[in-house]
Amino acid sequence: MLLGASLVGVLLFSKLVLKLPWTQVGFSLLFLYLGSGGWRFIRVFIKTIRRDIFGGLVLLKVKAKVRQCLQERRTVPILFASTVRRHPDKTALIFEGTDTHWTFRQLDEYSSSVANFLQARGLASGDVAAIFMENRNEFVGLWLGMAKLGVEAALINTNLRRDALLHCLTTSRARALVFGSEMASAICEVHASLDPSLSLFCSGSWEPGAVPPSTEHLDPLLKDAPKHLPSCPDKGFTDKLFYIYTSGTTGLPKAAIVVHSRYYRMAALVYYGFRMRPNDIVYDCLPLYHSAGNIVGIGQCLLHGMTVVIRKKFSASRFWDDCIKYNCTIVQYIGELCRYLLNQPPREAENQHQVRMALGNGLRQSIWTNFSSRFHIPQVAEFYGATECNCSLGNFDSQVGACGFNSRILSFVYPIRLVRVNEDTMELIRGPDGVCIPCQPGEPGQLVGRIIQKDPLRRFDGYLNQGANNKKIAKDVFKKGDQAYLTGDVLVMDELGYLYFRDRTGDTFRWKGENVSTTEVEGTLSRLLDMADVAVYGVEVPGTEGRAGMAAVASPTGNCDLERFAQVLEKELPLYARPIFLRLLPELHKTGTYKFQKTELRKEGFDPAIVKDPLFYLDAQKGRYVPLDQEAYSRIQAGEEKL
């Protein structure tokens, strides 16, 4: 009887709310009935129906708005224009560094000045312009102004230097580069290798001798530019907005394509799913060259009229003071930041704020409750997603440790799945029919999302590099003939459909809030070590988020000038990409296809009791690699050694 009532409830929801055809409803009910497992199904239904209905309604609302924007060819600048009309004099952005407040009208005028200036310099719809600067209000105004003209912004990671920076600038085919004065030295390092036709503009303090020749000071030029809205470009909702550089799965940073619909979808799902309000004030200390800071954070300002406080960089000691000063109600985080805050000594300010929600990803289950209780934050809004992925998740009901959920009852509504993979090679495991095998509750698997290019919520826009796209797409995943996006991440689903992040697979790992490409680091280290075989991988360190980089180097003699090596690394790699641990061994074992076998290396880690090869770690205070003995290992395990 209860099972019948449950099926009737599903029937009504599927037909009246989701408006699915009768055939699909019928087959779904039959499948649910046959696979329900009796009381187990009833238990899952009772515990999750409220969550699933809310999630379904959020998805329907966003789908309806996306469909409307698609039909009316609305773009982010057009949507922002309607926000300006609603709140012209409301504060849009606050830059903490200078306490600069911009209203929506001021942001609109600044971005229009950018569009008119670039148009006068010959840039047109479809061209690319790069932005290379630290967080501040102008960062938002620059890419928004470019979007008003139809120019696609390439948002460059400010940690990149030399080869990686040059790679991003050249592959983007940018016609212009706007860099902050704080980035001048990095631009000078690659200037000789840049295309001579690339127009250079510097924003911020002006020192002619500190910038490359032919560089122009942008700020006074924008003041003289017209502030009216330029003619609208022929852009639609699924056209390119900007590029965010990500390490992807292999090699140098790749330009992930962000179209207008993707920007809207990511911001809207967070807004409606976590019940945000137009009068919320967001504290955004995440990099604006990443999707979390620029889409999830800034998107609430541009699309929903919220005020966003921008900080140049995260500061654990100033975090709560800033929240109090600006009356912030929502704070953004990555898991590492939460740990830094917990490591701070208790102080009055941490309980005098008005923060009601912490929004982000990567908060470990082990510190989740401690974080929310110590700082009195009622809602932890954890989500999962990547710039280019089509299978974002949201933990809408604050289930401790979960990064999201998918309905066990109506799983077909949101076509994502965990599929079995080979633990050593991370290759997809397929059944006799050639289709990927779905994981059961409690079984780790790679998260995949079905690709439907005609659906803005299911499409995969990918990268500028087509070769990179091919590595992220698999065929015959849900059924024969389909395509799915491969996240490269291992998750686990429990009986109720909650999903928990387990590991980052493939050729990347996450450290200090950044994705580290092992292939890129391996190439750099090998070049510095006279082309020696080098395998780079991530290892777990107690008390830290993500995985610390470790490099196994083939050194038959065991000799290596580690002091010089550390000095050169400072110039070659950003801080988060430098290996924390080194292992010198006679040779590296390879597969038949000449790939390094990293599984055993990862398992052995950096424990000198297990690893008999010479081990070293990067001493943060000395700035060089020192021997890793049992005493140092114990300090690291106890969290007494700063990494």
Swiss-Prot record:
Organism superkingdom: Eukaryota
Expression by tissue: Expressed at highest levels in brain, testis, colon and kidney. Expressed at medium levels in heart and liver, small intestine and stomach. Expressed at low levels in peripheral leukocytes, bone marrow, skeletal muscle and aorta. Expressed in adipose tissue. Expressed in brain gray matter.
EC main group: ligase
Organism: Homo sapiens (Human)
Binding-site residues for AMP, renumbered to this chain: 243-254
Involvement in disease: Ichthyosis prematurity syndrome: A keratinization disorder characterized by complications in the second trimester of pregnancy resulting from polyhydramnion, with premature birth of a child with thick caseous desquamating epidermis, respiratory complications and transient eosinophilia. After recovery during the first months of life, the symptoms are relatively benign and the patients suffer from a lifelong non-scaly ichthyosis with atopic manifestations.
Gene3D superfamilies listed in its UniProt record: 3.30.300.30, N-terminal domain of ligase-like
Protein task: Mediates the levels of long-chain fatty acids (LCFA) in the cell by facilitating their transport across cell membranes. Appears to be the principal fatty acid transporter in small intestinal enterocytes. Also functions as an acyl-CoA ligase catalyzing the ATP-dependent formation of fatty acyl-CoA using LCFA and very-long-chain fatty acids (VLCFA) as substrates, which prevents fatty acid efflux from cells and might drive more fatty acid uptake. Plays a role in the formation of the epidermal barrier. Required for fat absorption in early embryogenesis.
Membrane topology, record value: Multi-pass membrane protein
GO biological process, one term: lipid transport across blood-brain barrier
Gene assigned in the entry: SLC27A4
EC code(s) of this entry: 6.2.1.15, 6.2.1.3, 6.2.1.-
Protein name: Long-chain fatty acid transport protein 4
InterPro entries, alphabetized: AMP-bd_C, AMP-bd_C_sf, AMP-binding_CS, AMP-dep_synth/lig_dom, ANL_N_sf, Lipocalin_CS
Upper taxonomic lineage: Eukaryota, Metazoa, Chordata, Craniata, Vertebrata
Ranges that cross the membrane: 20-42, 139-156
Localization per record: Endoplasmic reticulum membrane
Catalytic reactions of this protein: a fatty acid(in) = a fatty acid(out); (9Z,12Z)-octadecadienoate(out) = (9Z,12Z)-octadecadienoate(in); (9Z)-octadecenoate(out) = (9Z)-octadecenoate(in); hexadecanoate(out) = hexadecanoate(in)
Pfam families: AMP-binding, AMP-binding_C
Keywords: Disease variant, Endoplasmic reticulum, Fatty acid metabolism, Ichthyosis, Ligase, Lipid metabolism, Lipid transport, Membrane, Nucleotide-binding, Transmembrane, Transmembrane helix, Transport
Disulphide-bridged cysteine pairs: none
PANTHER family in the cross-refs: LONG-CHAIN FATTY ACID TRANSPORT PROTEIN, LONG-CHAIN FATTY ACID TRANSPORT PROTEIN 4
Family: Belongs to the ATP-dependent AMP-binding enzyme family.
Any one Gene Ontology cellular component term annotated for this protein: membrane
Note: SLC27A4/FATP4-mediated fatty acid uptake is associated to paramaters related to insulin resistance, which is associated with disturbed fatty acid metabolism and homeostasis, such as obesity. SLC27A4/FATP4 expression is positively correlated with acquired obesity.
